[in-house]
Amino acid sequence: IKFMSQYIIIYSIGPVGKFITSARTTHDLFAGSKILSKMCLRAILYFKNKGGQIIMPNENYNEPKKIESIPNRFVGKIDVNTQETLQQIIDDLKAQSLVELENFKDELVKNTNSTLTNKIQQQFDNYFKVYCVAGQLGDKPYHEVYNNLEKEMVAVKQSQKFNQVTIKGVIGEVGRKCNLDGENNVVLYRKTEKEDRTNQVSNKLFMNCNPPNQEVIVCNSADEQQYKIWEIKEGEGLSTIAAIKRIYENEAHKQFSTTKICLMHLFDKLELNDEINNFISRVEGSKDGNQKN
């Protein structure tokens, strides 16, 4: 007979600050936060499916589609009979977190060559860090186990594993960096009108590659067949993670502009001003041919 032991698990995914703040548009900010929430939610649902109980955050996980946002971490408890079972659950939690973005990554590598596919996969694999620590509850009070796990989590996060990027036998990435994160090489680029006319793209975009499209997905300035103009602008270059953020739930005119966000407090005041509202009504009426005197 194998006896069950109860374990407390703390799960966390990052990087948070760098991922969210690497942005040029309000959609980038929205997508960064939303993606981390969805990745954590997928891990939570898997954990519950394995018989786990979520302690924090407290949400109605029976209706996951109604959950708009959650933190990038959760605390749960689960009963397991062996250390191997616990380790398998932790490994699966890490894998489940990335499933949310696999489809977007696969969309990028569609119809690309092996060199570019490898480059995209390396950037994808090296970016997100999923951390899990677990401790047996036993006869110890919950707060004692939890506090010890928090200390372990801090230690684990500070002991980061280093992965060396290698492309075609060349150590490191040489070439133009992403407009969002400024760290990873560009994998998706939209040409400017001038580059379309001259049929030339700056050599800085590529890494000694002939033909150049082996290293970067290049779109013409007005080509919206594969990527819309609001997803990637002229002259803009995006890395794998930045491209996924830009594509994620991106619809035309869905997000407010940064200018409108800065002026929202003034718009709220104007809505309370009857004179302004009457003026707006007259202007809108004149557009419809019903101008009032």
Task: Give names to the regions the model predicted.
Residues 1-293:
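Regulatory and interdomain segments flanking nucleotide-handling catalytic cores
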